[in-house]
């Protein structure tokens, strides 16, 4: 976990829960007007929505307070900011979502909420978790009236790229210029894979549904639109796809190599100590532990594996007085100290 390699969170969060860094190394604020800003996702997803209320309200305060609006700021351009939020259809059933939507409607702050709706919440169909199986139907009471109070609620198909462009352009304009909050219900979304690497949506979807998802896959339809619009030919897209796949494979391989290098050095250090101990002491379990370390390393070296073995060995040699014991103790202390910085620092920022 290095900020230089993963500046979002130093690898403390899931890979898609990324966020911008708002502070410099000395703790001072960066100029947020000179960068794109994103706050990290949370799980369960609706729990990130109360934060959305505050982010959007900040823009309203900046716009309505003349002193703040006139001054050049690191945080606002006269209150013209829009807070974008994304959530899946099933997470809309969580309480924080409705509380936040109500607060946003009351405050009339610049928000664009995207609800990605693929008719499922992992394996649970919409009709089992959302009234009327349709979140925008449920939210109709929030639709703005002739007084202009409330939300502008729009519905658009996820595979229709031109319609998406038109919808988001309209929503962004309303939110930015008039501080009218918008909800975009993006329907007919598809699920390319299972919810996790161990999941498989083939287990709970009909063959008909799976065929529809293949035919209306958003990336496939986007590709068709590019060709139909004569932006690029099928052959050009095939070439780009092939080049991108090779690029990603190479980058993945290099990233893994860089990630494994310091772990390999620590792994070797532990193995050297254990091998030396094996020659001097009769510890029945030691052969098995060394073998396990070597076998697991074939698939990837992880700090928890060799640190766990180091602790087990340390418990076996507590009464011994030897250089290996001192080295192992120092190694464990060093890793534990470094781990406090890696994983425990700044937890309450």
Predicted region positions:
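Long, amphipathic alpha-helical stalk/connector segments used for oligomerization, subunit docking
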Residues: 176-177
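Active-site-proximal beta-strand/loop segments in catalytic clefts of secreted hydrolases
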Residues: 116-117, 158, 187
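Conserved thiamine diphosphate
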Residues: 63, 75-81, 131-170, 214-243
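Flexible loop/turn segments at secondary-structure boundaries
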Residues: 92-94, 119-123, 161-164, 190-195, ...
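Glycine-rich, charged/polar anion/phosphate-binding loops
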Residues: 97-100, 166-173
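Conserved acidic/glycine
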Residues: 189-349
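Cofactor-binding active-site loop characterized by glycine-rich and histidine/acidic residues
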Residues: 1-114, 121, 125-143
């Amino acid at each position: 976990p290095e900020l230089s390699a993963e500046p979002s969170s130093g690898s403390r969060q899931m890979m898609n829960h990324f966020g911008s860094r708002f502070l410099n190394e000395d703790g001072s604020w960066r100029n947020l007007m000179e960068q794109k800003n994103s706050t990290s996702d949370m799980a369960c997803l609706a729990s990130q929505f109360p934060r959305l209320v505050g982010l959007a309200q900040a823009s309203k305060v900046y716009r309505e307070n003349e002193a703040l609006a006139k001054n050049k700021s690191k945080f606002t351009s006269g209150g013209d900011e829009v807070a974008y939020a994304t959530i899946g259809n099933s997470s809309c059933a969580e309480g924080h979502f409705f509380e936040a939507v109500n607060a946003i409607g009351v405050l009339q702050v610049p928000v664009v909420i995207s609800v990605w709706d693929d008719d499922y919440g992992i394996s649970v169909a919409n009709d089992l978790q959302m009234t009327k199986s349709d979140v925008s139907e449920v939210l109709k009471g929030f639709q703005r009236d002739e007084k202009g109070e409330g939300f502008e609620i729009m519905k658009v198909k996820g595979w229709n790229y031109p319609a998406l462009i038109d919808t988001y352009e309209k929503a962004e304009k309303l939110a930015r210029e008039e501080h009218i909050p918008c909800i975009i219900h993006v329907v007919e979304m598809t699920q390319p894979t299972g919810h996790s690497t161990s999941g498989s949506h083939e287990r709970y979807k009909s063959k008909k549904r799976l065929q529809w998802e293949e035919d209306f896959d958003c990336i496939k339809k986007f590709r068709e639109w590019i060709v139909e619009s004569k932006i690029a030919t099928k052959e050009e897209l095939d070439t780009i796809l092939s080049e991108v796949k090779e690029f990603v494979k190479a980058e993945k391989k290099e990233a893994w190599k860089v990630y494994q290098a310091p772990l390999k050095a620590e792994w070797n250090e532990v193995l050297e100590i254990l091998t030396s101990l094996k020659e001097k002491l009769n510890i029945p379990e030691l052969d098995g532990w060394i073998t396990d370390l070597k076998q697991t390393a074939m698939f990837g070296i992880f700090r928890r594996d060799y640190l766990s073995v180091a602790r087990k060995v340390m418990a076996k040699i507590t009464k011994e007085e030897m250089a290996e014991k001192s080295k192992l103790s120092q190694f464990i202390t060093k890793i534990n100290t470094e781990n406090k910085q890696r994983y425990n620092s700044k937890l309450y920022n």
